[in-house]
A protein has these predicted regions:
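Soluble or luminal CAZymes and related metallo-dependent hydrolases
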Residues: 2-9, 62-66, 98-102, 106
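Short periplasmic/luminal acceptor-recognition loop of GT-C membrane glycosyltransferases, typified by
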Residues: 2-60, 70-71, 79-92, 120-128
Length: 146
């Protein structure tokens, strides 16, 4: 994967808004169906992945248990920036990975807690908009009230 102008702009933006070694999450546009993600971003930007599940693979990070752990990692590491890369979302391999797993809790978490701050072709950079209070606990309390 070569670093082109879009990637350079994305890296520069994150470097200007975070500290070296700070955790950021570089994910896919959607996490219920995966092809690949841009893990080179972590190396180029000199930023850390907040979770051991940074290399996204169908059948792993598309499961409820792993997405739940990823959410807990994003919360516990106080990740303020999330990068959603939509480049490979439409890729459909000739196997079961072309179908949605139906698990969308990571995307729901990102949508509920991060707001768009910058965009580039196929890339959206989001900034944390809510406090780090434990998303599952807030979600459970909200469901009890309803």
């Amino acid at each position: 994967m070569q670093v082109g102008s879009v990637e350079e702009e994305e890296v520069e933006y994150i470097q200007q808004h975070t500290r070296p070694g700070e955790d950021v999450y570089s994910g896919a546009g959607r996490h219920d169906k995966l092809f690949l993600n841009d893990i080179l971003f972590y190396f180029i930007s000199k930023r850390e992945a907040p979770t051991k599940w940074y290399y996204l693979e169908p059948g792993l990070e598309t499961t409820y248990a792993i997405q739940k752990q990823m959410i807990q990692d994003l919360d516990s590491h106080h990740v303020t920036y999330v990068i959603r890369n939509f480049t490979w979302d439409a890729v459909a391999e000739p196997n079961e990975s072309r179908f949605s797993s139906g698990v969308t809790i990571l995307d729901q978490y990102i949508d509920a807690n991060y707001k768009p701050e910058a965009s580039f072709p196929q890339i959206l950079i989001l900034h944390r908009a809510t406090p780090f209070l434990g998303w599952f606990e807030r979600r459970r309390k909200k469901q009890v009230r309803e």
